[in-house]
């Protein structure tokens, strides 16, 4: 960490390489300790709640899970929901599901909802959500197949990697890139300063 910033111990409770890169861009020192919670089981149990509430709940559960083992650290956790017509598009995990997701989203508007929280000693200190709205071009079968072969975005909600070639799939985007990628940086920076986790 540079001399410009003074900080308390921080953990990012995420296995996402993109969130890791976004955090690194802030110049912070932090540990990466992914949560062991079962996201799919939690989503099934909370399938009747509002989608934003579901995202916040998932972020909180991840942070609280890690906080039990690291009480001295401030835990940052996040969750990302890709939503169209009140349906959540989870990580496709395989090629055929990714094809299906892009077919369904083709030519339509959908939302990427980024949910964040900060926890210390199993207490929730801050929570936040931000939404980006994206509209895909009408995608041909050939385009879908070629894109998926190029990036294999099977671990990405919505079956695209916006940080890479995925940008070419869209005709309109409203919202910040870091929100689309799952870690809205300015709200997080302000929260860390306000909570005195980071000083300048």
UniProtKB/Swiss-Prot annotation:
Record-level GO cellular component terms: cytoplasm
Enzyme class: hydrolase
Pfam family, one: Maf
GO molecular function, one term: nucleoside triphosphate diphosphatase activity
PANTHER family: BIFUNCTIONAL DTTP/UTP PYROPHOSPHATASE/METHYLTRANSFERASE PROTEIN-RELATED, BIFUNCTIONAL DTTP_UTP PYROPHOSPHATASE_METHYLTRANSFERASE PROTEIN-RELATED
Family in the record: Belongs to the Maf family.
Protein name: Nucleoside triphosphate pyrophosphatase
Lineage: Bacteria, Pseudomonadati, Pseudomonadota, Gammaproteobacteria, Legionellales
């Amino acid at each position: 960490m540079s001399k410009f910033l003074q900080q308390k111990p921080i953990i990012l409770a995420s296995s996402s390489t993109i969130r890791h890169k976004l955090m690194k861009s802030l110049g912070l020192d932090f540990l990466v300790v992914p949560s062991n919670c079962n996201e799919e089981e939690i989503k099934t149990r909370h399938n009747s709640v509002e989608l934003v509430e579901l995202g916040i709940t998932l972020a909180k559960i991840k942070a609280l899970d890690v906080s039990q083992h690291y009480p001295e650290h401030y835990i940052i956790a996040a969750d990302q929901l890709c939503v169209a017509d009140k349906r959540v598009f989870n990580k496709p995990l395989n090629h055929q599901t990714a094809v299906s997701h892009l077919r369904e989203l083709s030519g339509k508007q959908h939302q990427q909802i980024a949910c964040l929280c900060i926890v210390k000693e199993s207490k929730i200190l801050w929570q936040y959500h931000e939404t980006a709205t994206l509209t895909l071009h009408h995608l041909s079968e050939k385009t879908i197949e070629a894109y998926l072969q190029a990036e294999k975005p099977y671990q990405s909600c919505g079956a695209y990697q916006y940080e890479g070639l995925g940008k070419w799939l869209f005709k309109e985007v409203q919202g910040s890139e870091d929100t689309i990628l799952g870690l809205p940086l300015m709200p997080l920076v302000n929260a860390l300063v306000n909570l005195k986790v980071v000083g300048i």
